[in-house]
Amino acid sequence: MGKVAVGATVVCTAAVCAVAVLVVRRRMQSSGKWGRVLAILKAFEEDCATPISKLRQVADAMTVEMHAGLASDGGSKLKMLISYVDNLPSGDEKGLFYALDLGGTNFRVMRVLLGGKQERVVKQEFEEVSIPPHLMTGGSDELFNFIAEALAKFVATECEDFHLPEGRQRELGFTFSFPVKQTSLSSGSLIKWTKGFSIEEAVGQDVVGALNKALERVGLDMRIAALVNDTVGTLAGGRYYNPDVVAAVILGTGTNAAYVERATAIPKWHGLLPKSGEMVINMEWGNFRSSHLPLTEFDHTLDFESLNPGEQILEKIISGMYLGEILRRVLLKMAEDAAFFGDTVPSKLRIPFIIRTPHMSAMHNDTSPDLKIVGSKIKDILEVPTTSLKMRKVVISLCNIIATRGARLSAAGIYGILKKLGRDTTKDEEVQKSVIAMDGGLFEHYTQFSECMESSLKELLGDEASGSVEVTHSNDGSGIGAALLAASHSLYLEDS
């Protein structure tokens, strides 16, 4: 063999070796990066763990905070607000009642005709009205005038089926889903606006007084019988159909719980004890925090960068507003530290809240062999054209970890309420039925979440006690609940 041929062979061999080394190095780098992805996944799973022992600690901490919040204002992270609702609907209510539900950029007006135990809700009608953006930041009178005018127009469409007896004033339940310091069943001052509203002159004002003045200005004769928040409304709606309902929980964009407490168990209540001996407490449980909550680095940074750092910690790990955002933050770390999506981080992945909880739910629910829905969601939301099956499996694992933690902590919260009420065990063979009325898009539409929550609650209660506890969906409880509370606190109860 000549020198040229030998030289060529050596060069070729060297080139092949170089390519082989490069391939091996890339494979090693790739396996190294994949190892980092799996390490991030494993650490996240461990930090989110909710063994039954931890859930019991969370439930016990919830019960302790409930006692503290009932003892004094400011004594707990749980506000434990007195709702002044001491007479929940029983099903006996009769007559025509109205509801106004204001909780965001739309409001609803509703009327219901109640026919007592036999007929229940005979008929109902509602209308949804959008609030023009300029009224959300304008003057208080302008906003309440707009609402009163819409209500007057709705009343004007009342047909003969909705009969109001002679000499009887129309009565309204007002669901107002903004922070309010309630001073009676039908009065409360606005603490602050949320959800894009910013009308400074209304802060500190009695919202019922503001609506009453607007009703007078438009010439509508209507008594506001009850001011309630959406969770108390859900409790009222649940109790109307089932006398065993003891609490209501909303799991939606946000989260909250309300329950029926013995009036004698509320040390901070200084008024006359209600005849019923009961009082509905609005817990504002989204603000619960405890050293027992399994918080991760992602939760801490999400909280730090939020508009209300240090507040609403439970809400930030269990509610629909935040679950998708937690997923985005973990994927971003995988992309930055382990090149999960390749050498460049998808620019869309850096946009906060771009992954919404409905997206996460759709991916988590993907049962196709190649996880096609996961691939298409990642493509549509993050503009990542292709993903491997093992990448999609990681995304599913993350969805499962985040949803499981949220669902199990929700169950621990409910268990804490049942413990406070002494309904977490069966006593002396006595079967005391306890029903929890649930509402909210997260509970209603995220199947894996709601199923995990219910199975975790059963696990906490044990076989015997879980037989006497039931979770039911109280669809749109807050809307009809306000009308039902107007009915149960009507001036005309005797007439009914």
From Swiss-Prot:
Q: Which reaction does it catalyse?
A: a D-hexose + ATP = a D-hexose 6-phosphate + ADP + H(+); D-fructose + ATP = D-fructose 6-phosphate + ADP + H(+); D-glucose + ATP = D-glucose 6-phosphate + ADP + H(+)
Q: Where in the cell is it found?
A: Mitochondrion outer membrane; Nucleus
State the pathway, as annotated in the record: Carbohydrate metabolism; hexose metabolism; Carbohydrate degradation; glycolysis; D-glyceraldehyde 3-phosphate and glycerone phosphate from D-glucose: step 1/4
Q: Where is the Hexokinase domain?
A: 35-487
- Where are the stretches annotated Hexokinase large subdomain? 229-476
Keywords per UniProt: ATP-binding, Glycolysis, Kinase, Membrane, Mitochondrion, Mitochondrion outer membrane, Nucleotide-binding, Nucleus, Transferase, Transmembrane, Transmembrane helix
Q: Which SUPFAM superfamilies match?
A: Actin-like ATPase domain (SSF53067)
Task: Report if keyword ATP-binding is assigned.
Answer: yes
Q: PROSITE patterns this protein is in?
A: HEXOKINASE_1, HEXOKINASE_2
Effect of mutating residue 416 to A: In gin2-2; insensitive to glucose
Tissue specificity annotation:
Highly expressed in flowers and siliques, at intermediate levels in roots and stems, and at lower levels in rosette and cauline leaves.
> Which positions bind ADP?
104-106, 253, 441
Q: A single Gene Ontology molecular function, please?
A: fructokinase activity
- GO annotation terms (biological process): glucose mediated signaling pathway; glycolytic process; hexose catabolic process; programmed cell death; regulation of secondary shoot formation; regulation of transcription by RNA polymerase II; stomatal closure; sugar mediated signaling pathway
Which Pfam families does the entry link to?
Hexokinase_1 (PF00349), Hexokinase_2 (PF03727)
Q: Indicate the transmembrane segments per the record.
A: 4-24
Q: Which terms in the GO cellular component ontology are assigned?
A: mitochondrial outer membrane; mitochondrion; nucleus; plant-type vacuole; protein-containing complex
Q: Where is this region: Hexokinase small subdomain?
A: 90-228
Which family is this protein grouped under?
Belongs to the hexokinase family.
Oligomeric form and interacting partners: Interacts with RPT5B in nucleus. Interacts with RHIP1. Interacts with KING1 in mitochondria. Interacts with CLF (via SANT domain) and EZA1/SWN (via SANT domain) in nucleus.
Q: What is the protein's known function? A: Fructose and glucose phosphorylating enzyme. May be involved in the phosphorylation of glucose during the export from mitochondrion to cytosol. Acts as a sugar sensor which may regulate sugar-dependent gene repression or activation. Mediates the effects of sugar on plant growth and development independently of its catalytic activity or the sugar metabolism. May regulate the execution of program cell death in plant cells. Promotes roots and leaves growth.
Q: What is this protein called?
A: Hexokinase-1
Q: Which organism is it from?
A: Arabidopsis thaliana (Mouse-ear cress)
Give me the gene this protein comes from. Answer: HXK1
